């Protein structure tokens, strides 16, 4: 049986990274699929106000119209050809979200960010198959808050005002815990280089290892926060990658679900301990063995990464 981890690893090997060093910057041209819907409208407006270079949107049957003073197109291909967009964000209901991702892959959009929660896993298995056959498109999500480079580009539903341009790369399976880490790193004066919410579903497009590779190679990123949760083996695989690819950048982690009972889904579709695997303790031990500093309280992420950054500076 093919596991989510195996599919994710294969995708990571097939994708060839391009500039910018961590996926987005102020030059990224973004379109929105589901542009004229309630969610697409609300979050596109927020992105524009933040300064994101939104260049248009897609709503089938509404091509030729204007929305938020931007052009509306019937297809992703048309939008890409007309605007030069290289990223798309998807606010499409679960029954149609996989088709929206496939359309973006077919159009060879470089970055696809799918916010939608509740996409059937069978649909996502088919999407993963398409992703694994190509090297033009990277998917972030689904069921994620998105990605942000503070002060430059916001693609997703995260609150922009808590972010501050800085030096900490944050990758997380949890949206709200991402915001907690952001608020704390802003409060202690470190700020963030890039924040990536990889999503809480079993079949996602970008995993911890993909993000660790980018953060360790990114000159702006001087420290890393990794937020995991119960379910799957993504954290253990990330720990093994760090053992095989040591970095001098401090890595701090928090794993949610320490007291979660086996066999019960805890929020996200992927947050379930099954078959004796995926519990918080095994993830924590694996990360510690890789030299990661694990905090047992999300309230201490900011002070812990600051401490580790200062320790490195004073060596």
Curated annotation (Swiss-Prot):
Main location: mitochondrion
Database matches in Pfam families: CoA_binding, Ligase_CoA
Pathway this chain belongs to: Carbohydrate metabolism; tricarboxylic acid cycle; succinate from succinyl-CoA (ligase route): step 1/1
Documented EC number(s): 6.2.1.4, 6.2.1.5
Active-site feature positions: 268 (tele-phosphohistidine intermediate)
Location within or outside the cell: Mitochondrion
Key word Phosphoprotein present: yes
Chain sites annotated for binding substrate: 179
PROSITE patterns: SUCCINYL_COA_LIG_1, SUCCINYL_COA_LIG_2
Catalytic activity: GTP + succinate + CoA = succinyl-CoA + GDP + phosphate; succinate + ATP + CoA = succinyl-CoA + ADP + phosphate
GO CC annotation: membrane; mitochondrion; succinate-CoA ligase complex (ADP-forming)
GO biological process: succinyl-CoA metabolic process; tricarboxylic acid cycle
InterPro entries, per the entry: Cit_synth/succinyl-CoA_lig_AS, Citrt_syn/SCS-alpha_CS, CoA-bd, CoA_lig_alpha, NAD(P)-bd_dom_sf, SUCC_ACL_C, Succinyl-CoA_synth-like
Family to which the UniProt record says this protein belongs: Belongs to the succinate/malate CoA ligase alpha subunit family.
Job description of the protein: Succinyl-CoA synthetase functions in the citric acid cycle (TCA), coupling the hydrolysis of succinyl-CoA to the synthesis of either ATP or GTP and thus represents the only step of substrate-level phosphorylation in the TCA. The alpha subunit of the enzyme binds the substrates coenzyme A and phosphate, while succinate binding and specificity for either ATP or GTP is provided by different beta subunits.
Protein name: Succinate--CoA ligase [ADP/GDP-forming] subunit alpha, mitochondrial
Organism: Dictyostelium discoideum (Social amoeba)
Species classification: Eukaryota, Amoebozoa, Evosea, Eumycetozoa, Dictyostelia
């Amino acid at each position: 049986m093919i596991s989510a981890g195996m599919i994710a690893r294969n995708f990571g090997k097939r994708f060839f990274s391009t500039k910018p060093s961590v996926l987005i910057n102020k030059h990224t041209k973004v379109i929105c699929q589901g542009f004229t819907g309630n969610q697409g409208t609300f979050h596109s407006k927020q992105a524009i106000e933040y300064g994101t270079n939104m260049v248009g949107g897609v709503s089938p049957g509404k091509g030729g119209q204007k929305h938020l003073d931007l052009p509306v197109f019937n297809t992703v291909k048309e939008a890409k050809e007309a605007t030069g967009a290289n990223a798309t964000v998807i606010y499409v209901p679960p029954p149609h979200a996989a088709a929206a991702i496939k359309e973006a892959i077919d159009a060879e959009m470089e970055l696809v960010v799918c916010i939608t929660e509740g996409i059937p896993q069978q649909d996502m298995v088919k999407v993963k198959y398409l992703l694994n056959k190509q090297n033009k498109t990277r998917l972030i999500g689904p069921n994620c808050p998105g990605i942000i480079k503070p002060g430059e580009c916001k693609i997703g539903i995260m609150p922009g005002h808590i972010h501050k341009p800085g030096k900490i790369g944050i990758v997380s399976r949890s949206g709200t815990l991402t915001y907690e880490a952001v608020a704390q790193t802003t409060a202690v004066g470190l700020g963030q280089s890039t924040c990536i919410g990889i999503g809480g579903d079993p079949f996602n497009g970008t995993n911890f290892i993909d993000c660790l590779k980018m953060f360790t190679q990114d000159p702006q990123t001087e420290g890393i926060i990794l937020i995991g949760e119960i379910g799957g083996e993504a954290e253990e695989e990330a720990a093994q990658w760090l053992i095989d690819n040591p970095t001098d950048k401090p890595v701090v982690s928090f794993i949610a679900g320490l007291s979660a009972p086996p066999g019960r889904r805890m929020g996200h579709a992927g947050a379930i301990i099954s078959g004796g695997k995926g519990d918080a303790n095994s993830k924590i031990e694996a990360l510690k063995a890789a030299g990661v500093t694990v905090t047992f309280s999300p309230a201490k992420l900011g002070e812990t990464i600051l401490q580790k950054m200062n320790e490195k500076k004073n060596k």
